[in-house]
């Protein structure tokens, strides 16, 4: 039995290794090192499309211990003259000296390393080369960086808490994922768009599609997510059938991909929207920043989520958690801002870890008229929500584990499973990014006045009957724009 368990564990480790290797499809270019006389050296790689950061970490005549920061620890955030270049103008190197180093590149929003680098000084480069230079002792003067606004300096690197794709990050405070959406379409190396009907646990009144510019497009450096009607998008009424085809991202030959409105009490969903998620990027602990402009339409939920990579604590009903960085709801003439650590799908447990920032009507807090920065700081002990740099919500395990959460006398059905994790479980596993729009549904609006009843067999039709009266105005207010997303290690 023990041998069998060891074999299973070994097989799982091997599969994980293959998965990680499959993700690392990009190889960091070999660093070019030039040493100058009487002092200074450069480390560089060639520029290429997709690189947004190059980092160098090194020590002189002393091997690096793993991914330590080293004597030199610098991020270069802009290429010059076709190369990403780290420059030291102070240190004097002599023949026989050895530079030990590792480099790091963010390519297409993902981080890659070249580890265990070493370089032995055999001579000098450039016009200052000298065949017989005098022996110059290594400077012990602390290194002082040049005043270069294009260089982001991080000396005294601290051990990070963040993990990315199952591996520890190199240093706290580093940019590990970024997309500023400046291309003509979503980067397929970073994102995967959904194409499926909605389902449990919220059964939204929409289908997600991946090929409709009316619901998802990139323009002026923004992702624009919009709502559309089934009638406009597919020229189909409620009582007709719709097959999303081989590109469906749900389970084939199920209600994820095919529905016949004639056989359903509620017919086809009346709305079409979009949703996309990070393809090969997931992380545990970090700082997520999203600059976005929210929709104002009633019963449209903007999705700026973190979703679990693996259902460690349960598959259904958000038992493995969902982190909502930000979403909004109309409230009279104002727009309320919410954040949430969702532990279960049904009330009263669903909203027990919600945070609310009531709308004030002030221009500075009109979440739909202008862009705002929505931030989540996720550490092993707490979750902090910020908007425009100001903290407005904290949820943590200092006063008790999340597994102990109760509401109206009810406990979490997965509480015993959560006790196997940390106090912050289920938020002690890797999560991935999700952006999108959903419309209506069950659970999402349980406490709000709405034209449909929870679990009613014809809830979608009741929703559409109400919205149809104000369709054009409602659609005009059903947009969300995202300027950028950035993830930093902590």
From Swiss-Prot:
Gene this protein is translated from: GNBP3
Entry-linked PROSITE patterns: CBM39 (PS51969), GH16_2 (PS51762)
Glycan attachment residues as annotated in the record: 362, 373
Entry's Gene Ontology BP terms: antifungal humoral response; antifungal innate immune response; carbohydrate metabolic process; detection of molecule of fungal origin; innate immune response-activating signaling pathway; pattern recognition receptor signaling pathway; positive regulation of melanization defense response; regulation of innate immune response
Protein name according to UniProt: Gram-negative bacteria-binding protein 3
GO MF term list: (1->3)-beta-D-glucan binding; (1->3)-beta-D-glucan immune receptor activity; lipopolysaccharide binding; pattern recognition receptor activity
Species in which this protein is naturally found: Drosophila melanogaster (Fruit fly)
Keywords recorded for this protein, A-Z: Glycoprotein, Immunity, Innate immunity, Secreted, Signal
Role description: Involved in the recognition of invading microorganisms. Binds specifically to beta-1,3-glucan and activates the phenoloxidase cascade.
GO cellular component term of the entry, any: cell surface
């Amino acid at each position: 039995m023990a041998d069998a368990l060891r074999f299973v564990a070994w097989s799982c480790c091997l599969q994980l290794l293959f998965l990680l290797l499959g993700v690392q499809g990009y190889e960091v270019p070999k660093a070019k090192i030039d040493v100058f006389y009487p002092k200074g050296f450069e480390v560089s790689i060639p520029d290429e499309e997709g690189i947004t950061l190059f980092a160098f970490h090194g020590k002189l005549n002393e091997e690096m211990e793993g991914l330590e920061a080293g004597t030199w620890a610098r991020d270069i955030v802009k290429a010059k003259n076709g190369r990403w270049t780290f420059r030291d103008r102070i240190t004097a190197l002599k023949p026989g000296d050895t530079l030990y180093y590792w480099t790091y590149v963010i390519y297409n929003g993902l981080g890659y390393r070249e580890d265990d680098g070493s370089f032995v000084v055999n001579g000098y480069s450039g016009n200052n080369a000298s065949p017989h230079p005098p022996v110059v002792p290594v400077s012990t003067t602390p290194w002082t960086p040049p005043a270069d606004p294009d260089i982001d300096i991080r000396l005294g690197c601290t051990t990070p808490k963040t993990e990315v794709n199952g591996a520890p990050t190199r240093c706290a405070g580093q940019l590990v994922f970024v997309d500023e959406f400046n291309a003509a379409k979503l980067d397929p190396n970073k994102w995967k768009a959904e194409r499926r009907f909605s389902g449990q646990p919220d059964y939204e009144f929409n289908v997600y599609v991946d090929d409709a510019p009316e619901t998802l497009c990139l323009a002026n450096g923004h992702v624009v997510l919009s709502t559309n009607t089934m009638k406009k998008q597919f020229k189909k009424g409620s009582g007709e059938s719709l097959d999303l085809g081989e590109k469906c991202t749900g389970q084939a030959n199920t209600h994820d991909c095919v529905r016949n409105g004639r056989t359903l009490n509620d017919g086809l969903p009346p709305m079409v929207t979009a949703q996309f998620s990070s393809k090969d990027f997931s992380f545990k602990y970090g700082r997520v920043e999203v600059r976005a402009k929210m929709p104002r339409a009633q019963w449209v939920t903007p999705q700026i989520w973190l979703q679990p990579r693996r259902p460690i604590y349960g598959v259904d009903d958000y038992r493995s958690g969902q982190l909502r960085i930000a979403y909004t709801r109309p409230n009279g003439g104002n727009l309320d801002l919410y954040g949430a650590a969702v532990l279960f799908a049904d009330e009263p447990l669903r909203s027990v870890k919600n945070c609310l920032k009531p709308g004030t009507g002030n221009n500075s807090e009109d979440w739909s008229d202008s862009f705002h920065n929505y931030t989540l700081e996720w550490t092993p002990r707490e979750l902090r929500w910020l908007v425009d740099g100001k903290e407005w919500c904290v949820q943590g395990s200092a006063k008790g584990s999340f597994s102990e959460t109760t509401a109206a006398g009810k406990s979490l059905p997965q509480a015993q499973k959560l006790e196997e994790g940390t106090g912050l479980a289920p938020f002690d596993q890797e999560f991935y990014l999700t952006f999108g729009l959903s419309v209506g549904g069950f659970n999402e609006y349980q406490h709000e006045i709405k034209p449909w009843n929870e679990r009613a067999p014809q809830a979608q039709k009741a929703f559409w009957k109400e919205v149809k009266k104000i369709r054009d105005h409602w659609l005009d207010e059903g947009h969300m724009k995202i300027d950028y997303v950035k993830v930093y290690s902590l």
